[in-house]
Curated annotation (Swiss-Prot):
GO terms for molecular function: GTP cyclohydrolase I activity. The keyword Hydrolase applies. This is GTP cyclohydrolase FolE2. Belongs to the GTP cyclohydrolase IV family.
Length: 256
């Protein structure tokens, strides 16, 4: 049969990335407490395309993913991208997996357990034999405005914020490590289950530890600086301001 994809392109221009996205894949990831956990990932796969080819072979991405059934780590990601490079005869391959990661978390006073879900992303780009691997997680925290507290006779405005951490490392890093760094950066952690005594604790703790969005991003960056395995990071914090019709944000990236 005619291979239309390998025919000459009418416009001889190279393409940085071409591929497939929104594939759904059962995934096993490493869990610090129980060893591993099963989740579902949304997957995007792509390669570069030289100027002289009309198109890429989309089915080969799906074939590579179907043949990949390893637990997610650096080596298994390396194997997936190596296979994509080979199948599509490309120079550069990229993969992104987004998935929920669940942790059972105790309420601070009652000790009642509730499931917290964190949005995680693993990205990889391979050129030749070199793989650049990035792990990311989004973690909700609570913030109380220091200015509002300082100028008010009673109370202060508080809100939820999201700390988005992305890292490159020398060796394996637990997702839990990043979650703990993020949760320690705000006025207080967020919990899925709170009884009255827990709610009292969270309220009092957060109001005794007011933080601007600037404080949160700096605290998270400092925690990442202290981690022995993290080589590079980017932290983005977005605060969903309760008294404004806009959000506040701050970002710090370690130079590469």
């Amino acid at each position: 049969m005619e291979d239309v994809q390998n025919s000459p392109a009418k416009v001889a221009m190279s393409i940085d990335r071409v591929g497939v996205r929104d594939l759904t894949l059962p995934l096993v990831v490493r869990d610090r407490e129980s060893g591993s956990q099963s989740t579902m990932a949304k997957v995007a796969l792509s390669v570069d395309l030289p100027a002289h080819f009309k198109g890429t072979h989309m089915s080969r991405f799906v074939e590579a993913l179907e043949d990949w059934s390893e637990e997610l780590d650096y080596q298994s990601f390396y194997n997936l991208l190596s296979d994509i490079l080979r199948r599509l005869e490309a120079e550069r391959a990229h993969a992104e997996l987004s998935f929920p990661y669940c942790l059972q978390k105790k309420s601070p006073v009652s000790g009642r357990k509730g499931i917290m879900s964190y949005e995680c992303t693993v990205e990889g780009e391979m050129v030749g034999d070199n793989l650049e691997f990035t792990l990311g997680v989004k973690v909700p925290v609570m913030t109380v405005c220091p200015c509002s507290k300082a100028i008010s006779d009673e109370g202060a405005h508080s809100q939820r914020a999201v700390v988005h951490i992305r890292t490159k490392s020398k060796g394996f890093v637990w997702i839990e490590d990043l979650v703990e760094i993020a949760e320690a950066s705000g006025s207080c952690e967020v919990f899925s289950l709170l009884k009255r005594e827990d709610e009292k604790h969270v309220t009092e703790k957060s109001f005794s530890n007011p933080t601007f969005v600037e404080d949160v991003v700096r605290n998270a960056a400092m925690g990442l600086e202290k981690h022995s395995k993290i080589l590079w990071y980017q932290v983005d914090v977005e605060s969903f301001e309760s008294i404004h019709n806009h959000c506040a944000f701050a970002s710090i990236a370690k130079p590469k």
